[in-house]
UniProtKB/Swiss-Prot annotation:
Cofactor comment text: Binds 2 Zn(2+) ions per subunit.
EC assignment: 3.5.2.3
Binding site for Zn(2+) 2: D151, H178, H231
Record's function text: Catalyzes the reversible cyclization of carbamoyl aspartate to dihydroorotate.
Protein name from the UniProt record: Dihydroorotase
CDD domains documented for this protein: DHOase_IIa (cd01317)
Organism, as annotated: Bacillus thuringiensis (strain Al Hakam)
Catalytic activity of the protein: (S)-dihydroorotate + H2O = N-carbamoyl-L-aspartate + H(+)
GO molecular function annotation: allantoinase activity; dihydroorotase activity; zinc ion binding
Keyword set, alphabetical order: Hydrolase, Metal-binding, Pyrimidine biosynthesis, Zinc
Family to which the UniProt record says this protein belongs: Belongs to the metallo-dependent hydrolases superfamily. DHOase family. Class I DHOase subfamily.
Pathway assigned to this chain's UniProt record: Pyrimidine metabolism; UMP biosynthesis via de novo pathway; (S)-dihydroorotate from bicarbonate: step 3/3
């Protein structure tokens, strides 16, 4: 099916929001201009809505295989499509881990069979993510690994991390890191700060993250490797990443929507839906994340979509697993709480969710260019809705944002020229 989207707005190559039509033919973007006419195309009047590149998320957890009670590739990618994401990168903390040919081939077959959006799987750095034996990077790359990570755990052995970075550099691949120094975790369930002290909970200190990042940055410099930092959360982490970039070290970084919108002061009680890793930090950390995003220290926004069952989250904040869902709330949360409040511009938000992650990892995504695959998201910036977890397509309903009123909701997502998800009656 060919589509002609009429009367929309998009961000042009100069970074300005302008009026446009957009023609999709044979799965490709055929033309982006005003007043397009075309035969043999279904006309969809978007009536002033934003025509954006499909959103790109480099940090997601789809749970399959091994955790299908939390999420599946089918439910997770449907949720991604509903959130406007057309390309997502799946972390390897599944069971089994994609750490060898057999496991990666099985995962790729599942993706091919079940995914509603583009899914790029990470390969594990170490076998079973156990930290002691390196995987076969060459084989995993051959089978389509997006990059290498042991996300969910930090690689504790510096010699292992250095060897991994050297091998990844030879393959022109990135090493992506969840940064925690295990000896500093302190059996914590929240940030070590006012909230942990008030509620008598073990806290995870900020330095647990930043000291690990500092170590890895020096290793990346020695290996001449692209090193990407997951879900930055502390002022100290922002500082060391900024210093590394100024020194010319190949480091990039991401931040989550929840760390941009919340800090520990916003946790109303010992509610497990506010338990994520890294935890919500202090006000100074939150301010540093915003500053880092604006000055280029932090390159992109990634959801760290981490679904869990209601039963798992009901165990209490000390026993419940870390993580919140992110696909279906990311854009409206960020648009409402950052763009509408004048903290960043709409153009910047689009870049942080599209071209910045795509360019960082060399993906042909993130821009509406003629000849490119038609991965597109239509967003109604005027639509206001209350976040209702019962309507999520994800199996995970674990969110701290239930009841929040937000503007800027995706209403249609196109993947490879086909409609992957559409809000009922939104574009009739």
């Amino acid at each position: 099916m060919n589509y002609l989207f009429k009367n929309g707005r998009y961000m042009n190559e100069e970074g300005k929001i302008v009026a446009t039509d957009l023609l999709v033919q044979d799965g490709k973007i055929a033309k982006v201009a005003e007043n397009i006419t075309a035969d043999n195309a279904e006309v969809i009047d978007v009536n002033g809505k934003l025509i954006a590149p499909g959103l790109v998320d480099v940090h997601v957890h789809l749970r399959e295989p091994g955790g299908e009670h939390k999420e599946t590739i089918e439910t997770g990618t449907l949720a991604a499509a509903k959130g406007g994401f057309t390309t997502i990168c799946a972390m390897p903390n599944t069971r089994p881990v994609p750490d060898c040919r057999e496991h990666m081939e099985d995962l790729q077959n599942r993706i091919k069979e079940k995914a509603h959006v583009n899914v790029l799987p990470y390969g594990a750095i170490t076998v079973r993510q156990a930290g002691s034996e390196m995987t076969d990077f060459e084989t995993l790359k051959e089978l389509g690994a997006f990059a290498f990570t042991d996300d969910g755990v930090g690689v504790q052995d510096a010699s292992m991390m250095l060897a991994a970075m050297k091998r990844a550099a030879k393959l022109n691949m990135a090493v992506v890191a969840h940064c925690e120094e295990n000896t500093l975790i302190n059996k914590g369930c929240v940030h070590e700060g006012k909230f942990s002290e008030k509620h008598g909970l073990n806290g995870i200190p900020s330095v647990c993250e930043s000291v690990h990042i500092a170590r890895d940055i020096l290793l990346a410099e020695a290996a001449d490797c692209h090193y990407h930092v997951c879900h930055v959360s502390t002022k100290g982490s922002v500082r060391v990443i900024r210093d590394a970039k100024r020194a010319g070290i190949k480091v990039t970084a991401e931040v989550t929507p929840h760390h941009l919108v919340l800090c520990e002061d916003d946790i109303p009680s010992a509610d497990p839906n506010f338990k994520m890793n890294p935890p919500l930090r202090g006000k100074e950390d939150h301010a540093a994340l915003i500053e880092g995003l604006l000055d280029g220290t932090i390159d992109m926004i990634a959801t760290d979509h981490a679904p869990h069952t209601a039963e798992e989250k009901a165990q209490g904040i000390e026993r419940a697993p870390f993580g919140i869902t992110g696909f279906e709330t990311a854009f409206p949360l960020l648009y409402t709480n950052l763009v509408k409040k004048g903290i960043i511009t709409l153009e910047q938000l689009i870049q942080f969710l599209t071209e910045k992650p795509a360019d960082t990892f060399g993906l042909e995504a993130g821009r509406l260019k003629e000849g490119r695959t038609a991965d597109i998201t239509i967003i109604d910036l005027e639509q206001e809705e209350e976040i209702d977890p019962t309507t999520f397509l994800s199996k995970g309903k674990n969110t701290p944002f239930a009841g929040w009123k937000c503007q800027g909701w995706p209403v249609m997502t196109i993947v490879g020229g086909k409609i992957a998800w559409q809000k009922e009656s939104a574009l009739v």
